[in-house]
Amino acid sequence: MLLYIFFLMYTTRSRDMSTLQSNMFKFYNAPHSGMYPTFWVGHLKTMIKICVKRSDVINFNKPLDKEMLEMMYGSLLGDASAEKRKGGKGTRMLFYQEGSHNEYLLFLHRLIANLGYCNTNIPKLQTRISNNGKIRKIIKFSTWTYDQFNEMHKNWYINGKKVLPNDIDQFLSPLALAIWIMDDGGKMGKGLKLATNNFTLNEVKQLMAMLDVKYNIKSTMHKTGAMDQYNMYMLSDSMPILVKKIKPYIVPSMKYKLGNYM
């Protein structure tokens, strides 16, 4: 009986995954003009060059453009990570989202693929068993390995632990802020929560001060319940200011995080 129940769970999950993957493919290949803010449409054009292996790539020696760096910094403030390759000289970026946010990750993948920094194969939903035994759907992809990413890894990591880099102010643009919120923000009452629990208390305070000075966005800290972990909460009075700055970059599937302010 137990085996039969497991079989039913597996076949149901397989059908669900197949349906989700089919819907993702339709979304990925849909025309994006009119669907996304004008800023992104040029970046989300149909692939001109299909890159599925390293020999297809032509930008390994080019400097990173400012928009790419801002997107990387915004992503690293959230769930993204930079990985120094073992036995190699370069670094790659890894992007991860829960399956419920697959549209955002597909958007990010298509964007970065069109900029020439990752494989153009469409990411696939995967299943994982969490520590409490629940089945989770996740979706992820990584960039190619670049020497140009080494400086970013050096700035963001000390002894393998993510830290807030000294040059964060230089790259915390409205674009980076939008990417950070889409990646790791969450609606909380009339404000917005950012999961900053991976950063130290002083780093969270630094981010709060930076947003205040740079954009006049006020925020507070909330303890997460775990020792020495804090989340940021952007106050409702600052939400109109925030939305005005980031609205040109927010994709449709992430508008819900900003509630009625969008």
Swiss-Prot record:
Its main location: mitochondrion. This protein is responsible for splicing and maturation of cytochrome b mRNA. Specifically, it may be responsible for the splicing specificity of the second intron. GO terms for molecular function: endonuclease activity. Pfam families: LAGLIDADG_2. This is Cytochrome b mRNA maturase bI2. Encoded within intron 2 of COB. Belongs to the LAGLIDADG endonuclease family. Keywords: Hydrolase, Mitochondrion, mRNA processing, mRNA splicing, Nuclease. The keyword Hydrolase applies. The keyword Hydrolase applies. It comes from Debaryomyces hansenii (strain ATCC 36239 / CBS 767 / BCRC 21394 / JCM 1990 / NBRC 0083 / IGC 2968). It is found in: Mitochondrion. InterPro entries: Homing_endonucl, LAGLIDADG_dom. Gene3D superfamilies: Homing endonucleases (3.10.28.10). GO terms for cellular component: mitochondrion. One of its GO terms (biological process) is mRNA processing.
